[in-house]
Amino acid sequence: MKSSVEKLSETRVKLNVEVPFEELKPEIDQAYKALAQQITIPGFRRGKAPRQLIDARIGRGAVLEQVINDMLPTRYQQVVEENELVVLGQPHIDITKLEDNEVVEFTAEVDVRPEITVPDFSAFAVEVPALKSNDEAIDAQIDKLRERFGELKDTKRKLKTDDFAIIDIEAAIDGEKLEEATTEGMSYQVGAGDLIDGLDTALRGLKAGESAEFTTTLKAGEHEGKEAAVTVTVQQTKERKLPELDEEFVQTASEFDTVEELRESIAEQVAEQAKAEQATAIRDEVLKAALAEATFELPEGVVEDQIHAQLHQLLNQVGGDEAALNAALEAQGTSREQFDADNRKNSEEAVRTQLFLDALAEQEQPEVSQQELTDHILFTAQSYGMDPNQFITQLQQSGQIGNLFSDVRRGKALAAAICRVSVKDDEGKAVDPSEYFGEEEESAEESE
């Protein structure tokens, strides 16, 4: 077999392959054997008909078609390996010459990973937010717990932010009442801001039995974008009374006995969350710096595949209905054009990041243990809300376990590189990235 590689661009090559027929004997033998099992020729047992009779019955062309189908994947892969190409996606293959008993020639165009120069991470210096005092965060968590056990009490005063109200709403356009925008006896928290623009402003200062009128622009439904006159009437006003923060409440609302124990537990949770956020900030800043340093061309075919995959995923959520997708986007205050632009930008960023991390992993050569791979598979299954055994079965059937292995490998490579970066917080204090990304902290999730 003869082959050559023609460079079409930094990210695409064309393989020219010539295979003499004498090298195709295994595929030819297998093709005749398979076809002999599929046809019946009088006087011969199934599978025993001679080749010339098979040619006469179905034509030599059918045999050659089978041979071509069998030989293309293996010969293509052989050329890829011989030339040490890192191919991306599926090739576009054309049979350019077929001379029976002489030669088969074909070309294969395919995207390849561009040359990527991995920068020196030890030269990077990044700044991240400092770990702040967590008293406010602790108090906020305790208040959330108190709110879960709070009681709504009737009031006679004017409504203010965070109060609750039982309200009636009526909307009209040009004096015509809109049934779909009319409701009675609805509970609403003032300041929620998730119903109608202008509603919170109208409610503040009202008492039970009072009404207010305002004009708003409808953001969804048949009359989306139109101006509507809205009347809101308050039936009842309520405020949430929070329980006292004492031992009785703590014992009712948690597994702890004292307020001090509750605060200590929440403080630990808040501190861990703050550290996780700082670790994420370090990772993001380092990766941003590395990608800015390592500029390279993106393979357009891979980007297009990513764009189509994201679009397909979103379309599945609306039953594959393009019109429904466009309507949903408009309801969110955007457009299909903006979505497509954002999708392309995000897809390019995703492809650029993955290609860079693959190059980094080749440089770092991290080892991935079976336990690390298993942990990542279990973590991913949990994130999808799937049974781990069912998830593993799906991975095996679709041949996707290798992708998760690559996720872990990329994560470990990036973790090792981050440990060489100089990190300070925005208060000027040095931060040791190995506390987050050292060997004992490495995990598959760091690649997410």
Curated annotation (Swiss-Prot):
One of its GO terms (cellular component) is cytoplasm. NCBIfam families: tig (TIGR00115). HAMAP family: Trigger_factor_Tig. Residues 162-243 form the PPIase FKBP-type domain. Residues 437-448 have a biased composition (Acidic residues). It catalyses: [protein]-peptidylproline (omega=180) = [protein]-peptidylproline (omega=0). Belongs to the FKBP-type PPIase family. Tig subfamily. The keyword Cell division applies. Involved in protein export. Acts as a chaperone by maintaining the newly synthesized protein in an open conformation. Functions as a peptidyl-prolyl cis-trans isomerase. It comes from Corynebacterium diphtheriae (strain ATCC 700971 / NCTC 13129 / Biotype gravis). Residues 426-448 are annotated as: Disordered. PROSITE patterns: FKBP_PPIASE. Its EC number is 5.2.1.8. Consists of 3 domains; the N-terminus binds the ribosome, the middle domain has PPIase activity, while the C-terminus has intrinsic chaperone activity on its own. The gene is tig. Coiled coil: none annotated. It is found in: Cytoplasm. Keywords: Cell cycle, Cell division, Chaperone, Cytoplasm, Isomerase, Rotamase. This is Trigger factor. PANTHER family: TRIGGER FACTOR CHAPERONE AND PEPTIDYL-PROLYL CIS/TRANS ISOMERASE (PTHR30560), TRIGGER FACTOR-LIKE PROTEIN TIG, CHLOROPLASTIC (PTHR30560:SF3). The keyword Lipid biosynthesis does not apply. The lineage of its organism: Bacteria, Bacillati, Actinomycetota, Actinomycetes, Mycobacteriales. One of its GO terms (biological process) is protein transport. GO terms for molecular function: peptidyl-prolyl cis-trans isomerase activity; protein folding chaperone; ribosome binding. InterPro entries: PPIase_dom_sf, PPIase_FKBP_dom, Trig_fac, Trigger_fac_C, Trigger_fac_C_sf, Trigger_fac_ribosome-bd_bac, Trigger_fac_ribosome-bd_sf, Trigger_fact/SurA_dom_sf.
